[in-house]
Amino acid sequence: MEILASRTLFRPVDYQRSLSFYRDQIGLAIFRDYGAGTVFYAGQSLIELAGHGAPEHPAGPFPGALWLQVRDVRATQAELESRGVSIAREARREPWGLHEMHVTDPDGVTLIFVQIPDDHPLRRDTRGERRNPEGEPEANI
């Protein structure tokens, strides 16, 4: 199997309210508006708000979160606050080393804005690195 592309798909309770939130408050650029829904650019991914159909599962909070990497989480927080976005959890450094700030969309979906510090392991290039059976890098001999 070859995955060619992916996107996160939401079926909001109130399409117009969610459209305004993602477009006007969060500031995502529109990739495509197809009448019954809108697709936004989100870095190298896409987020789609479907204004049609109904989910096959009971209504309830989305069990996950939308993880959005930004260059500067504090500047992002200030920008969102200036647009009237309520910050659910202020920017801070997490025990795992990432800088995170949380916002909640109109349907209760958590958006986690993440800044990866320059010295964080996520920035290390591990291509070609040999690993032992436990998944840890092998020492160079």
For each predicted feature, which ranges?
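Conserved short beta-strand elements that form part of the metal-binding/catalytic scaffold
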Residues: 29-61, 110-115
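Short acidic/glycine-enriched loop/turn segments that link adjacent beta-strands
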Residues: 34-36, 94-99
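N-terminal beta-strand motif that seeds the catalytic metal site of vicinal oxygen chelate
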Residues: 1-16, 46, 64-66, 117-141
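A common structural junction motif
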Residues: 26, 83-88
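Vicinal oxygen chelate
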Residues: 5-13, 38-41, 56-83, 99-109
